[in-house]
């Protein structure tokens, strides 16, 4: 199934070991090179990867929004274990206003026990949940974020609640919600409750793309893949014809120190088509 005639290309900038000025320079380069979105990760530290410090995603995204004009901006993905969904809703409403409607909210369910980023949650005393609990929490988080954006003033669920008088937001239109997924159940949750899914590249990619193709009911549902950039490849890496036919967007991951020359060359090669 062909979703679109052309796959849009985005970048996600790793905050690990990068300065704020390097992130902003890379964001401007990405926009100038024709990329459609500039995203960043939501991590407290890069220590688990021996990459040193991280950067707060929403501080950086606000700055990126201020120095760009056309690209979409947002976290890929916001870790739902790091903050209350109401706090996330307020942060994204601010980013949507600051960016003049260019914000997109990527959401993830948090680290699994024993995974490489589990220590990040343990460091600040956040409980590690099993898979079914994380799935329920993510579903409830989506519901609560949407309700806060809609101006509803109370909510009570399994994991979260808000009470009267609620929250007042300056939000003309809500950002789309994209779920980060590496497994079938999360893809199915995205199909049921979100505006799109961002699938991690790997052995299951085609299987998960087929799940989307067989079950998506909305023509507006957006399918993207997250892949590490290949700086030695003129187009940043390969997509098979089957993958290209099932994707709306490809998100290339760049790490610091950012090779802006390579970013520009790749962007000019793939975004002029």
Residue ranges and their predicted role:
Residues 1-273:
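Active-site-adjacent structural elements that line small-molecule/cofactor binding pockets in enzymes
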């Amino acid at each position: 199934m062909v979703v679109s005639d052309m796959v849009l290309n985005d970048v996600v900038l790793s905050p690990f070991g990068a300065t704020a000025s390097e992130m902003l320079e890379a964001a401007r380069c990405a926009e100038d090179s024709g990329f459609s979105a500039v995203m960043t990760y939501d991590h407290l530290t890069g220590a688990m990867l021996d990459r040193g410090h991280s950067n707060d995603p929403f501080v950086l995204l606000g700055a990126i929004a201020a120095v760009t004009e056309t690209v979409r901006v947002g976290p890929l993905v916001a870790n739902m274990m790091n903050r209350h969904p109401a706090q996330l809703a307020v942060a994204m409403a601010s980013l949507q206003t600051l960016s003049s409607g260019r914000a997109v909210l990527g959401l993830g369910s948090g680290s699994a026990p024993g995974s490489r980023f589990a220590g990040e949650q343990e460091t600040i005393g956040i409980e590690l949940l099993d898979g079914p609990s994380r799935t329920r929490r993510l579903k409830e988080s989506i519901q609560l974020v949407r309700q806060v954006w809609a101006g509803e003033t109370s909510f009570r669920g399994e994991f979260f609640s808000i009470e009267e008088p609620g929250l007042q937001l300056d939000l003309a239109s809500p950002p789309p919600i994209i779920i980060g997924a590496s497994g079938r159940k999360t893809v199915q949750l995205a199909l049921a409750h979100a505006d799109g899914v961002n699938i991690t590249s790997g052995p299951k990619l085609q299987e998960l793309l087929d799940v989307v193709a067989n079950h998506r009911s909305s023509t507006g549902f957006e399918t993207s893949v997250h892949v590490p950039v290949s700086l030695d490849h003129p187009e940043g890496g390969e997509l098979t014809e089957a993958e290209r036919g099932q994707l709306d967007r490809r998100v290339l991951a760049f790490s610091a120190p950012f090779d802006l020359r390579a970013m520009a060359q790749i962007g000019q090669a793939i975004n002029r088509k």
